[in-house]
Amino acid sequence: SQYVYSAGSDSSDDSKSNYYDDAKKLVKRAGKLEKKEKIDKAKKLYSQAFKKLEKAYSSEKKNPDILNYMGYTSRKIGNFEQAEKFYLTGLSIKPDHNGINEYLGELYVQTNRLDKANERLDVLKNCNCEEYKELELIIKTRGSKVY
């Protein structure tokens, strides 16, 4: 969701949404490092992003996008149990969230729960979206294609 602030607003007023934006930038940078196989550096950025997401979440408990990124960053640093909790909390707010359904499916592939991954794929089947195609490929290749 977008936030609009009046021109006279104090910078501290909009810092909450900036945590989320900053976290997204860190995630993007971490993804680029991962592609270059700089995994340790990527994990550090994912951890930094997670800390910013926690701050964003503290003021926006009902934002499924923040929960999606919290799940994503947790999964990327190897904390699968925590990631699953964030994804499931996000789905309890917005069950048809394409990103959460895809990433939760990827987590299920990573943790050898293909039946559950296929359930997420089934939720996405009518979305006509990239998330469906990506999860379908990951399931078919058992995760040999990048998560």
Where do the language-model regions lie?
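Terminal, low-structured helical/coil segments at or just beyond the last alpha-helical repeat
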Residues: S9-N18, N118-Y147
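Structural marker of alpha-solenoid helical repeat scaffolds
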Residues: S59, I93, L124-C127
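Residue-level recognition of tetratricopeptide repeat
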Residues: N63, H97, C129-Y132
